[in-house]
């Protein structure tokens, strides 16, 4: 979810065993609900009016959706609290092209579950309340591809390369931490 320039890493809640277990249960319950509707349709019943068992199953699916949403929201709030409780002078975030990421069918589910905009807006509001300057880095600033040590832009860096190795100076760092350090020091930003 977030990597901070001081090296702290906030994990993606959707990769936790608890979230995966809930998603697995949700898929199972949705399949059961779908089968109930299909059986009702085969028997000639109206799908507009649901039986008591269908209503119970719909309620259990809704509860699971709510539990997953609460789990994600809680994690989001905990991360935001951890970020602002140390009262930094400023917080800089990337202006991500979420619309473009949503067009990639391999990324779209993960991106929508992350709720980037919601996270950024909550963080902005919290920073504003506390009095922390909130910066949004330019969308086209190459934070991941720029070497933090020498400033060289590694234009051929692929997304699957998780370790950044500068071809000029040999600087080696975790790709996301390198991006966090670059975002901290960037002059390409606007204040939100």
Predicted segments, located by residue:
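Positively charged, helix-rich recognition surfaces that bind polyanionic ligands
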Residues: 1-192
């Amino acid at each position: 979810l977030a990597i901070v320039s001081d090296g702290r890493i906030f994990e993606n809640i959707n990769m936790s065993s608890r979230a995966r277990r809930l998603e697995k249960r949700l898929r199972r319950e949705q399949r059961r609900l779908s089968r109930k509707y299909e059986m009702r349709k085969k028997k000639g019943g109206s799908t507009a009016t649901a039986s008591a068992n269908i209503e119970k199953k719909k309620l259990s699916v809704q509860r699971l959706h709510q539990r997953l949403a609460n789990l994600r929201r809680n994690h989001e709030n905990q991360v935001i609290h951890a970020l602002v409780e140390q009262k930094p002078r400023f917080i800089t975030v990337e202006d991500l092209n979420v619309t473009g990421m949503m067009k990639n069918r391999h990324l779209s589910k993960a991106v929508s579950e992350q709720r980037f905009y919601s996270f950024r807006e909550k963080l902005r509001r919290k920073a504003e309340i506390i009095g922390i300057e909130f910066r949004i880095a330019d969308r086209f600033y190459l934070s991941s591809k720029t070497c933090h040590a020498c400033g060289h832009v590694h234009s051929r860096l692929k997304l699957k390369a998780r370790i950044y190795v500068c071809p000029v100076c040999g600087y080696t760092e975790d790709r996301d931490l390198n991006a966090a350090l670059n975002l901290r020091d960037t002059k390409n930003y606007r204040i939100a």
